[in-house]
Amino acid sequence: SAYRADPAGKPRGAVVVIQEIFGVNSHIRSVADGYAADGYLAIAPALYDRAQRNFEVGYTPDDIAKGRAVKDKVALDAALKDVQAAVKTAASAGKVGIVGYCWGGYVAWMAAARVPGLACAVPYYGGGTTTDQAIAEKPKCAVMAHYGEKDEHIPVEGVKKLAAAHPSVTVHLYPAPHGFNCDQRGSYDAASAKLARSRTLEFFRKQLG
């Protein structure tokens, strides 16, 4: 299944929105709604459906543990198949970009290298994107990546390594922790979220229309 948000008028293009470890929850739905309000068809595929249908939690420590447990049951290849299906559906609206947050940032980074049909990708603090294995991937579309300098999961050294290995990738660092874009988390950083969002939108306008 997937959450779909349609723009009011003719779409400028499409954005596939990839969830965090918390499922396609109210926050991810609101992110998709936001891109629809900016003129894009937004589709958020429920990547956890393969392991547990309709999984959706909040942000307590217990929720984090539950989310991680389900994530561990979803193989990357399976997730990328679902991304591919979403890209195919979204293509009716024009060029397709992908944006992902946390685990979804990792999925978006891998999709940029492995899923055909993407015009651009925007991973937000993708956990796992700074491993040697992920850095060895070769993105086949334009990429803009957002990271927080205070991210306790992703060391800045790793981000610098990724940036050095991929000069064509635009990498932005913010004085913020992991999850800074999510206004339902304690780690929310309004100023960084706003700046990252405006940069992402500008990037989508350039790459998608």
Which residue stretches match the model-derived regions?
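N-terminal cap/leader regions of alpha/beta-hydrolase-fold enzymes
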Residues: 1-209
